[in-house]
């Protein structure tokens, strides 16, 4: 199953969108791409939103028709994540699992916080840098529970199944064995990344510990069930667009509606302010 991207507008502009296509037809990365890539449910599909080492805060747009990837904004301005020394941009290929949802109406019994109303976040730790809209096949290794502004914001740790290291990584302790320091750096990155923007340090559940593969799979299962309730009308959709081209439900759209999406264009990125590359030195950050 091969997916391609359809890019609209210049990167680093308010108009830029990345749609995902299957066989040339736009699909929703939130609703149409299956969570599992094999019958055994051991390989999962992940949508890359933010490639490693980049700063533009891009995400699946929950509210827009077919949920394209766009750059997040704050007060009308494009959002870029700051560089907190010694890090540069994101440490991993960052993205989301399709057909998952962190229900904002449900308080998790262990984190004591409600879901963040987004698809489940994923950190892919393989060696290749991805691209926005890439659909990677990954295997699950573990999960961290960030508490972001009083919401549970799970971060699932995965690796691309085609990565040379993938056969050696089967659970969270293997990550520390083969990639020493990465989990500690991941904890620090999420803890401090909002400080340059005047926000307080983020907190973690479980004292910042990364839970194992079994725990992560339970979280994924819960979020997949929550998505099922969302698309079947059992949960309040709020502002979320449930438009899709494959589910065969009341929100499914036909090809005439899909034709309303503009044709793709491969435009160069717009210039961005050089201060995006500034390093911020955070007191108490480990080096």
Curated annotation (Swiss-Prot):
Gene Ontology BP annotations: cellular response to osmotic stress; phosphate-containing compound metabolic process
Transmembrane segments: none
Positions contributing to diphosphate binding: 79
Induction profile: Up-regulated when grown with elevated levels of potassium chloride.
InterPro entries hit by this protein: Pyrophosphatase, Pyrophosphatase_sf
Gene3D superfamilies: Inorganic pyrophosphatase (3.90.80.10)
Cofactor: Mg(2+)
Region (Disordered): 244-269
Positions bound to Mg(2+) 2: 121
UniProt entry keywords in alphabetical sequence: Cytoplasm, Hydrolase, Magnesium, Metal-binding, Stress response
Protein EC: 3.6.1.1
Gene Ontology terms for molecular function: inorganic diphosphate phosphatase activity; magnesium ion binding
PROSITE patterns to which the protein is assigned, alphabetical: PPASE
Family: Belongs to the PPase family.
UniProt protein name: Inorganic pyrophosphatase
Organism: Emericella nidulans (strain FGSC A4 / ATCC 38163 / CBS 112.46 / NRRL 194 / M139)
């Amino acid at each position: 199953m091969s997916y391609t991207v359809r890019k609209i507008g210049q990167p680093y502009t308010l108009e830029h969108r990345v749609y995902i296509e299957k066989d040339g037809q736009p699909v929703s990365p939130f609703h149409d791409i299956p969570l599992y890539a094999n019958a055994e449910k051991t390989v999962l599909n992940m949508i890359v939103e933010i490639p490693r080492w980049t700063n533009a805060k891009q995400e699946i747009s929950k509210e827009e028709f077919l949920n394209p990837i766009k750059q997040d904004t704050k007060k009308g301005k494009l959002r870029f994540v700051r560089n907190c020394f010694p890090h540069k941009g994101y440490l991993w290929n960052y993205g989301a699992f399709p057909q998952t949802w962190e229900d904002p109406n449900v308080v998790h019994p262990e984190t004591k916080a409600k879901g963040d109303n987004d698809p489940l976040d994923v950190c892919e730790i393989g060696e290749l840098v991805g691209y926005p809209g890439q659909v990677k096949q990954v295997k699950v290794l573990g999960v961290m529970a960030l508490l972001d502004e009083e919401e549970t914001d799970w971060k699932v740790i995965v690796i691309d199944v085609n990565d040379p290291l993938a056969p050696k990584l089967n659970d969270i302790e293997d990550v520390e064995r083969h990639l020493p320091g990465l989990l500690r750096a991941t904890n620090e990155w999420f803890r401090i990344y909002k400080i340059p923007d005047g926000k307080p340090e983020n907190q973690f559940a479980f004292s910042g510990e990364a839970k194992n593969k079994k725990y992560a799979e339970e979280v994924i299962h819960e979020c997949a069930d929550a998505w099922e309730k969302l698309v079947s009308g059992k949960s309040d959709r709020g502002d979320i667009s449930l438009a899709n081209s494959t589910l065969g439900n009341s929100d499914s759209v036909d090809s005439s509606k899909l034709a309303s999406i503009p044709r793709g264009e491969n435009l160069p990125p717009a210039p961005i302010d050089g201060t995006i590359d500034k390093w911020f030195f955070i007191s108490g950050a480990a080096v």
